[in-house]
Regions:
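Residue-level signal for pocket-adjacent positions within structured domains
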Residues: 37, 69, 149-151, 158
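C-terminal beta-strand-rich structural cap/linker in extracellular carbohydrate-active enzymes
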Residues: 158-173
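Beta-strand-rich binding/interaction modules
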Residues: 137-154
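Charged, E/D/K/R/S-rich low-complexity terminal regions of large eukaryotic assembly subunits
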Residues: 116, 144-146, 168
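A short acidic, often aromatic-flanked loop/helix-cap motif at beta-alpha or helix-coil junctions
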Residues: 49-50, 154-157, 168
């Protein structure tokens, strides 16, 4: 996990040149060539312009954050069951609760499973299956067990489970 992924934050590719601090970006004059875009401070609150990063009353942080980051702040996503932050919290809690998801051993080795085009499926040990729809359309997969966690709403029917586009589901088998 890299800074901001737990909030669903993208890399900022349009930092104004006058705010660049990374030597690669400064020398090239191109924000996309430096590392500043992935170093923009995390938004802790919904309060612009610094979104809780810095002392109370701050008017600027060391790199400017996009205006839309307030709605993706820790404060905005905390407690929202549909947020990326709560998905990560749930996934980490699941991993702590299920020893099989910890360090790989001979009993918990990852095994790739057959899956439809655009879908990755793997088993971890004898207890878990993960299905990931990398496509831009919903995909139907066999139901391998009990749904534990999903990144989007999964519809389960007798013919299989439908994974929305760009989603993942974790199953107990």
């Amino acid at each position: 996990m890299y800074q901001g992924e737990e909030l669903g934050l993208p890399e900022v590719l349009d930092i104004p040149v006058e705010f660049l601090v990374d030597p690669q970006g400064i020398q090239s004059g191109d924000p996309a060539k430096g590392r500043d875009g992935c170093r923009v401070p995390l938004p802790w609150s919904e309060e612009a312009p610094v979104y809780g990063f810095g002392p109370r009353g701050s008017t600027a942080s060391w790199l400017p954050a996009p205006a839309a980051w307030g709605e993706r702040s820790v404060a905005a996503e905390s407690g929202d069951p549909g947020s990326m932050l709560e998905l990560y919290r749930s996934a980490l809690a699941l991993r702590r609760q299920q020893p099989e998801l910890g360090a790989e051993t001979d009993d918990t080795a990852l095994v790739w499973l057959p899956a439809p085009a655009g879908v990755l499926a793997f088993r971890r040990g004898n207890g878990f299956v993960c299905t990931v729809n990398t496509g831009s359309e919903p995909a139907t997969v066999p139901v391998p067990g009990t749904l534990l966690l999903a990144s989007a709403e999964v519809s389960v029917a007798p013919g299989g489970a439908t994974l929305p586009a760009d989603s993942a589901a974790w199953w107990r088998i």
